C-alpha cells in the first residue's frame, strides 16, 4: 500500500504503510527484551530490618530473606537497604521508553487522521459524538487518550530519579515520591496499552487517499530516483544540480515536474520520455519496504507467541 514517505514534515520518497508498523514493531520487540532483562532485578525480596542491616535477625537474616523470596518467587536482595531504588526507577524509565513508542504511534495515527491527510482513521463506532456543536466531527479520541497517558508516564521518569536521592538509611520523603511515580506510571501504562490495542485492531486505512496524497507533488517525490538514474550517466552531483533546478521551478512556477524534466536538454539527452515517465512511478520506488514489513510481522508473531508461552508458564 504505497504512501508518501515524509521527513521534516515534507514529502521525501515513497514508502508503504506497512513500513510504519514495522518501525513500531521493531521498537516494541526491544521493549519486550528490556523488560525481560529487568524482571530479575525488579522483583526482589527485601527483608533486612529497619535499616537493612539484619540487626534484628542476626546471622539467620539472609536465610530468612531468601526463604521469603522463595515463597514470593523473587530473588533476595544482596544488600537489603531501604535506600536502594535504582531497580524501581529502572522500571519507570523502561515504562517511559514504552510510553514514548506508544505515544509516537498514536501521534502518527492522529496526524494521518487529520482532514488534510485522511489516510487512516481510528475506530469510530456508529453513534459516536465528536462534538456537541459540530455534527461532522470524527475526533481521534483514543489517540488523544494515548498521547496524554504517554505524557503522564514519561513525566514520572524524573520523579523516579529524584526518589533515588534518599538520605542515610531510609527516608519516607523519597519513598512517597517513588510510590507516587510507580503508581502513576503503571496505571497510566495499562490505560495507554488498552487503548492502543483498540486503535490498532480497528484501524481503517484509505489507500485511495494515500495515493492521492502521494501524487500531490506531481512527481516531485520521485526526484531522487530521477537524480540517481541520471547520475549514472552524468555523475551524481551534476545530476543533483540538474534535477534540483527542475524541482525548484516546479515549486516556484507551479509547473508539472514531468514537463520540466522533458524540456531540459541536459536530461532528455540521456532520458527519453518513456524513461522519465517510468522513473516518476512512485510504486516502483519503495525500496525494501515490503520485505521489511513482512519480516517485522514474522518477528512480531514470534515474540507474541513467546510472551503467551511465558504467561502460561507463570
Predicted regions and their residues:
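Short, flexible active-site-proximal loops enriched in glycine and acidic residues
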Residues: 1-7, 76-77
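Gly/Thr-rich phosphate-binding loop signature of adenosyl cofactor/nucleotide-binding cores
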Residues: 8-12
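Internal glycine-rich alpha/beta core junctions
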Residues: 13-166
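Catalytic-core signal marking the mid-to-C-terminal active-site face
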Residues: 132-314
